[in-house]
């Protein structure tokens, strides 16, 4: 009222009457209530002076349209050639494929021995695809622009990663290429002048995996009701104070819970939704035992791990909930009873790994805690990493020693694992990488460098573990998501595979001169490395590792999360399976 009176007193006499007439209306208006919604501005590639992104926007639009037309066979030749003006040549170097492919195997061919040369873009594509018999059965096409350079006043060149995949006569084929596309930028519309590059090929006669979700779980009402709906459905219906979030960072644990010789699985869920246990039955389907087993927690849960804690021959459960760790004893036939709770006051548990690190005959466990708990400055996803490329303000991981009789002690500091322990840790894995008889620990961290803690249990030192990641060559600066050990070269020493996030945009932007112009060379290189993708480290057998990521052709795992060494085709060599992507939504443009 004081403000209204002041404003009225400042008006002229002519305004007095109108002010008085509107006074009643003004006082009757409802008070404005501040809302919680906010409008996030969309990204404009033409703004900000990033000329490279302006070009990328135009090129990417054309390549996406070409991909769609290739998949759907919608006059793609006409469109491909319409992208060109005064096209010069398409040159592709491809591997030579034998006439006979071993049945039930996956084979890779990487030597570009054969040249394909065509005078039109469309002819180059069709000849390439016909050479591998997938022209008429194309299933997937993608173009990822990783770099753009200005070649001359009127020309630009884009470096592009290309994938073609298709099937013919029970043979699945994938082509992966690194190509250079030369464009004319003389006019408003960018036009293609030439395409040159090398391709590798992978051929599989294993057959396709079959999705059995509906046949094995479709008859379970609780499964359909909870998991056939997306994350957006639940976040719009469940109060955030329960612990639900938009991230979807929940894991799956597999074990023979009821001792019948069949694997069962347990799914962690965000707050407000119960964790679910599904028991395999003799007919090949699954039954929901969540409530019956007493592990249908409603607390926010990211990770769970089954292992035999008390050495009685069955699978007990360590569950990571928002407040900390819950220890559940398997009392028989898949029924559980709570035995202990371990609070984690500084950070939220995200993943759990177990091993007998001290060789006393029982399993201990290590907990990765991604980010610190919310304080006065609350965050819905995670705290802002500082610095972004090498953050040290994440959660505090914890090692719990099993002291028998359901007693566990936090020995993180005692055993030396608090060194470099403020990272954004997603996953960890135990392995005796140096073959000295005890378990070492590798930790994959988001926003920076990873840790390899060497276990020197036989040395007379105050602490057992030491971070040797930099000394042995496995720092792996990047957005670490997962880690897997496996002897891929069959030399008797475990090698290391780390899943990170490959980013084509990151490649383009970090390589530009104007990106972090004031930063030193090492910092800029770390940002560039951050976008590279997944990593493969070969164990040299002398305590050190060699980075074989680029030579091994394994960097592009897209937005990778979980990864695992596994001999998928049974040929005696370890393959790598990588889970990637993000939250599925109705808009296909969303990750």
Which residue ranges define each predicted feature?
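Bacterial N-terminal signal peptides
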Residues: 1-6
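Acidic, glycine/proline-rich Ca2+-coordinating loop motifs
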Residues: 10-591
């Amino acid at each position: 009222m004081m403000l209204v009176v002041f404003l009225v007193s400042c008006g002229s006499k002519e305004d007095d009457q109108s002010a008085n007439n509107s006074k009643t209306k003004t006082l009757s208006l409802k008070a404005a209530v501040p809302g919680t919604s906010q409008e996030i501005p969309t990204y404009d590639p033409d703004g900000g002076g990033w000329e490279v992104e302006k070009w990328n926007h135009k090129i990417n639009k054309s390549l996406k349209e070409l991909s769609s037309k290739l998949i759907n066979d919608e006059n793609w030749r006409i469109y491909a050639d319409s992208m060109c003006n005064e096209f010069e040549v398409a040159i592709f170097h491809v591997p030579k494929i034998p006439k006979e492919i071993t049945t039930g195997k996956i084979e890779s061919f990487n030597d570009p021995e054969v040249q394909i040369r065509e005078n039109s873009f469309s002819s180059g594509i069709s000849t390439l695809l016909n050479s591998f018999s997938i022209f008429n059965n194309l299933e997937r096409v993608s173009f990822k622009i990783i770099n753009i350079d200005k070649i001359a006043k009127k020309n630009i060149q884009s470096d592009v990663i290309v994938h073609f995949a298709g099937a013919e006569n029970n043979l699945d084929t994938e082509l992966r290429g690194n190509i250079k596309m030369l464009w004319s930028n003389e006019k408003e519309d960018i036009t293609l002048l030439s395409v040159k590059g090398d391709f590798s090929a992978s051929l599989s006669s294993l057959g396709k995996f079959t999705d059995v979700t509906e046949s094995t779980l479709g008859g379970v009402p609780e499964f359909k009701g909870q998991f056939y709906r997306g994350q957006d459905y639940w976040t719009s219906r469940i109060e955030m104070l329960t612990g639900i979030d938009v991230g979807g960072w929940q894991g799956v644990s597999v074990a023979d819970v009821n001792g019948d010789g069949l694997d069962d699985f347990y799914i962690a869920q965000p707050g407000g939704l119960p964790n679910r246990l599904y028991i395999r039955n003799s007919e090949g389907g699954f039954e929901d035992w969540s409530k019956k087993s007493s592990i249908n927690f409603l607390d926010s849960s990211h990770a769970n791990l089954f292992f035999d804690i008390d050495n009685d021959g069955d699978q007990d459960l360590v569950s990571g909930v928002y407040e900390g760790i819950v220890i559940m004893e398997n009392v028989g036939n898949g029924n559980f009873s709570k035995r202990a709770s371990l609070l984690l006051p500084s950070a939220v548990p995200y993943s759990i790994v177990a091993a007998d690190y001290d060789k006393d005959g029982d399993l201990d466990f290590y907990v990765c805690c991604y980010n610190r708990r919310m304080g006065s400055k609350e965050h819905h996803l995670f705290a802002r990493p500082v610095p972004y490329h090498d953050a040290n303000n994440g959660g505090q991981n914890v090692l719990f020693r099993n002291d028998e009789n359901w007693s566990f002690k936090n020995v993180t500091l005692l055993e030396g694992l608090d060194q470099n322990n403020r990272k954004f840790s997603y996953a960890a894995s135990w392995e005796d990488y140096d073959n000295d008889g005890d378990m070492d620990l590798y930790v994959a961290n988001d926003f920076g460098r990873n840790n390899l803690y060497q276990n020197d249990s036989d040395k007379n030192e105050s602490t057992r573990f030491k971070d040797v990641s930099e000394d042995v060559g496995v720092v792996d600066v990047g957005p670490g998501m997962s880690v897997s050990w496996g002897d891929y070269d069959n030399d008797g020493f475990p090698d290391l595979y780390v899943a990170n996030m490959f980013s084509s945009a990151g490649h383009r932007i970090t390589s530009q001169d104007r990106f972090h112009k004031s930063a030193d060379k090492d910092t800029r290189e770390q940002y560039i490395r951050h976008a590279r993708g997944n990593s493969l480290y070969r164990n040299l057998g002398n305590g050190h590792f060699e980075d074989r990521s680029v030579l091994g052709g394994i960097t592009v795992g897209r937005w990778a999360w979980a990864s695992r060494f596994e001999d998928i085709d049974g040929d005696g060599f370890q393959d790598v399976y990588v889970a990637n992507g993000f939250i599925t939504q109705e808009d296909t443009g969303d990750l």
